[in-house]
């Protein structure tokens, strides 16, 4: 191949030795040509010539005498590229589609032996001389079997994930045991929290009071540490950590041995609240002891379920709603905040699977417009999976009571980070409404709703919720692996709601650093228990 530019600059000639491109001339009037035009021409040719060279070489190697240059070009690059399909190919495609349509409605014979792999299918075709229809039928049966196996594997994966999410990791169990032992042997671990001179602060409304109910010591440490480190006024922070009787010693030890000064921490067990008696919480006592309820949360999660008509996502939601934590008193405590803290006017209630990234003190300045609950709504937002929750997502609207009292299109709101006006709350019947609907659902054998503790709260707080800006509380980090990282960085609170908690191995690796940032890996108890190693 040669490129020749005439001395007069009137023509550019391209020629090839094999006559694939015999001659190409670009003629230009001398008086109109400019160096810029020439430069652009040569630049275009620099991109074009390698392609022409390769194409010429291919044609030469394949044999240029067997076809014309353009015909070879079309044949080598494929008829579809040039939009040409010969009649025989069209007939073959039509016949194959016809066979597929016939086979799609045909019954697959019982006992049909299916190949284990595609290579075995090809081998069987050769050995048994399959016609096209037999091949299509066997191939369809193979695909359907593969789909069934894949579906069963997906449900098995979801079940295993459910059990993993409900279990206690070895490291966290170790941490609780070691801290409990420390409480019994170390007087400093038993020191009063807070110190006696700071006790009046626990009921002082000039401070910012946070309530955290959890039996997870590691999670509690992250919530408290992230709040203190993100605050512009840590000296104004008071944390009321509520736990159960078995975790109390370990929880107390942690905060006694790991000060978050100047913030103040109080640790109490549910058995230390005089108000929490069986007389005041009879419904929850019934929920915890009712056999059908216990079987629902602890029994066989697949028995009675029609998996053929259930999508994996729906099944995952049902499994999440059957977490044993939903029959724990700790998970219902927020409904009793006005009684548990009779001297406080406002509190922020936090779940233990959140991380605080910004100063939350402005929450106390938000005007709730006479409402009780400041919360982020979950029916609108960029993430349509996480932020598309309406009442229809939580309730069974085929139940007459639900259909009568609720609107399926009403926007839902989120637990996890809520600002509660306790003074206004005490003037309402929210607690009584909550108990009443719990009783109704218990009577109906859990046919009104099945997803945890939020549904009765959605009813009880109806008309008492003030929406707050969504930037205060970002949800979904425990089940949405495609969480927008930039939005997560900007959110005041990020919430790992869902099964993939950051302290579990099933947590999302790329979302875990937001949480581990506040884990004190230099702590001896953390190191000795090999947390998240």
Curated annotation (Swiss-Prot):
Transmembrane segments: 41-61
Pathway recorded for this protein: Glycan metabolism; pectin biosynthesis
Lumenal side: 62-533
Keywords, alphabetical: Cell wall biogenesis/degradation, Glycoprotein, Glycosyltransferase, Golgi apparatus, Membrane, Signal-anchor, Transferase, Transmembrane, Transmembrane helix
Enzyme Commission code(s) on record: 2.4.1.-
Source domain of life: Eukaryota
Record-linked InterPro entries: GAUT, Glyco_trans_8, Nucleotide-diphossugar_trans
Expression sites (tissue/organ): Expressed in roots, inflorescences, siliques, leaves and stems. Accumulates in pollen grains.
Topological type in the membrane: Single-pass type II membrane protein
GO MF entries: polygalacturonate 4-alpha-galacturonosyltransferase activity
Localization (cell): Golgi apparatus membrane
Matching Pfam families: Glyco_transf_8
Cytoplasmic side: 1-40
Cellular-component GO terms for this entry: Golgi apparatus; Golgi membrane; pollen tube
GO biological-process terms attached to the record: cell wall pectin biosynthetic process; pollen development; pollen tube growth
Reported consequences of knocking out the gene: The pollen tube growth defects of plants lacking TOD1 are partially suppressed by gaut13 mutation. The gaut13 gaut14 double mutant is defective in male gametophyte function; swollen pollen tubes disturbed in elongation, and characterized by a disorganized outer layer cell wall with an altered repartition of pectin (e.g. homogalacturonan).
Glycosylation sites: 306, 396, 445, 520
Similarity comment text for this entry: Belongs to the glycosyltransferase 8 family.
The protein's role, per its UniProt record: May be involved in pectin and/or xylans biosynthesis in cell walls. Together with GAUT14, required for pollen tube growth, possibly through the regulation of pectin biosynthesis and repartition in the pollen tube wall.
UniProt-recorded name of the protein: Probable galacturonosyltransferase 13
Organism: Arabidopsis thaliana (Mouse-ear cress)
Gene (UniProt): GAUT13
């Amino acid at each position: 191949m040669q490129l020749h530019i005439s001395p007069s600059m009137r023509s550019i000639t391209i020629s090839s030795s094999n006559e694939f491109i015999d001659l190409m001339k670009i003629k230009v009037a001398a008086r109109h040509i400019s160096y810029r035009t020439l430069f652009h021409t040569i630049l275009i040719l620099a991109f074009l010539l390698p392609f022409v060279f390769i194409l010429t070489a291919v044609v030469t190697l394949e044999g240029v005498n067997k076809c014309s240059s353009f015909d070879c070009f079309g044949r080598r690059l494929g008829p579809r590229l040039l939009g040409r399909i010969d009649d025989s190919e069209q007939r073959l495609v039509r016949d194959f589609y016809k066979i597929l349509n016939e086979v799609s409605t045909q019954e697959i014979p019982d006992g049909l032996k299916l190949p284990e792999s595609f290579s075995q299918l090809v081998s069987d075709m050769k050995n048994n001389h399959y016609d096209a229809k037999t091949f299509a039928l066997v191939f369809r049966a193979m695909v359907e079997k593969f789909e069934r196996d894949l579906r069963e594997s997906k449900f098995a994966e979801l079940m295993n994930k459910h059990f993993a999410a409900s279990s206690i990791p070895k490291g966290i169990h170790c941490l609780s045991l070691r801290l409990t032992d420390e409480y019994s042997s170390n007087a400093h671990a038993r020191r009063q929290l807070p110190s006696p001179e700071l006790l009046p602060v626990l009921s002082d409304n000039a401070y910012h009071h946070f309530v955290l109910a959890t039996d997870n010591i590691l999670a509690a440490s992250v919530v408290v540490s992230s709040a203190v480190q993100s605050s512009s006024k840590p000296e104004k922070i008071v944390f009321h950590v509520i736990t159960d009787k078995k975790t109390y010693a370990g929880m107390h030890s942690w905060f006694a041995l790991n000060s978050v000064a100047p913030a103040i921490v109080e640790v109490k067990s549910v058995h230390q609240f005089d108000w929490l008696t069986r007389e005041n919480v009879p419904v929850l006592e019934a929920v915890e002891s009712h056999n059908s309820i216990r079987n629902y949360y602890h029994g066989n999660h697949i028995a009675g379920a029609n998996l053929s008509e259930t999508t994996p996502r729906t099944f995952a939601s049902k499994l999440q709603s059957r977490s044993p934590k939903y029959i724990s008193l700790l998970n219902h405590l927020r409904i009793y905040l006005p009684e548990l803290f009779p001297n406080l006017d406002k509190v922020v209630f936090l779940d233990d699977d959140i991380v605080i990234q910004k100063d939350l003190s402005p929450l106390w300045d938000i005007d709730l417009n006479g409402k009780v609950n400041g919360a982020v709504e979950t029916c609108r937002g960029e993430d349509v999976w996480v932020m598309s929750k309406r009442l229809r997502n939580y309730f069974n609207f085929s139940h007459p009571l639900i259909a009568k009292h609720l609107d399926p299109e009403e926007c839902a709101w989120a637990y996890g980070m809520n600002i509660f006006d306790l003074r206004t709350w005490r003037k309402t019947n929210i607690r009584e409404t909550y108990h009443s609907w719990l009783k109704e659902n218990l009577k109906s054998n859990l046919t009104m709703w099945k997803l945890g503790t939020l549904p009765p709260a959605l009813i009880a707080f109806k008309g008492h919720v003030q929406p707050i800006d969504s930037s205060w509380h970002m949800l979904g980090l425990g089940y949405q692996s495609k969480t927008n990282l930039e939005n997560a960085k900007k959110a005041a609170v990020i919430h790992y709601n869902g099964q993939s908690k950051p302290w579990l191995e099933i947590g999302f690796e790329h979302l875990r650093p937001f949480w581990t940032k506040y884990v004190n890996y230099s702590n001896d108890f953390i190191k000795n228990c090999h947390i998240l190693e």
